[in-house]
């Protein structure tokens, strides 16, 4: 792997131990995956923020870095934490958990990482341009950046994204190379599914769950998804579910995604997969693990856009919920929802607009929640293992109706 003289100095420890460790990690990754050099990045998005997921060992790792007074070299934002950083007491979060979570946040702050704590950084200012090289870690954000925006990133781990942010570079391999962005599977929706389409936004989570299971870590091309006229929130949900059930970090969709005009495929014998009503029905059945009533309704995995919050507020006007409701979003989106009056409507109905976190990385199992209703395919995949929760999966209207 070729290194510049400056990069060699960093690797030799001439600029301190933290930079040496960061460079060593990036060079090691480059060696493993056959990168020939490091390339500059324009931004980073760092996972491994919730104390629930990184525990004491992650906290110590971050505080070791922060005490050396090292700063990130590029614009870097954080993934969700394990709690709302302001109203954690109101949510019932244990004080011991909260104190350690706040130490994690303080460590990132010292390194000048933006404390936006969201899995949708592209909605809050971390918006890469077409073809830009970035180093992002959150799986749903990686999918959106690669696919919808046409930026270039591998699915990084938290430490490698942090190292890239501190060095300002990443190894040149994987999805940074055009030859690794070609279609491996063609997905076609059955004509009957399209002509008799009866689903709401949860359809994209179910479809993503199904395609992720089939394609695994390949690159699907959706031949006729555009006929359903999905919006960016739908594409966000689709990519998140595919990344959760498989390992998909990039997809193409005719007339919808950034690189769709050049339909390059791996070879002439590419597999074509047809998905119809029965397959979607089966996906819904698998994602639903209980018929009982939920004790928590969670919407916002990935974090809600303003339009999603507006829809929830409209559905909850003059209503009262029987179950707890968390509407998860970023600090930025919540500020606008507050101004628009959406937060007040949701709170009047008995719900909460929760920022900085989501149902998957917060300790909801310790708060007594056992059955969670969600419209998110990604959350439906992760909740049983991450939170020991049973899942009710469906459209927002269904989840809020009669509850």
Swiss-Prot record:
Top-rank EC class of the record's enzyme: lyase
Gene Ontology biological process: isoprenoid biosynthetic process
Catalytic activity: (R)-5-phosphomevalonate = (2E)-3-methyl-5-phosphooxypent-2-enoate + H2O
Keywords associated with the record: 4Fe-4S, Iron, Iron-sulfur, Isoprene biosynthesis, Lyase, Metal-binding
CDD domains xrefs: AcnX (cd01355)
GO molecular function, one term: 4 iron, 4 sulfur cluster binding
Keyword ATP-binding: no
EC number from the UniProt entry: 4.2.1.182
InterPro entries: PMDh-L-like_dom
Pathway entry: Isoprenoid biosynthesis; isopentenyl diphosphate biosynthesis via mevalonate pathway
Entry cofactors: [4Fe-4S] cluster
UniProt similarity note: Belongs to the AcnX type II large subunit family.
Entry protein name: Phosphomevalonate dehydratase large subunit
Organism: Methanocaldococcus jannaschii (strain ATCC 43067 / DSM 2661 / JAL-1 / JCM 10045 / NBRC 100440) (Methanococcus jannaschii)
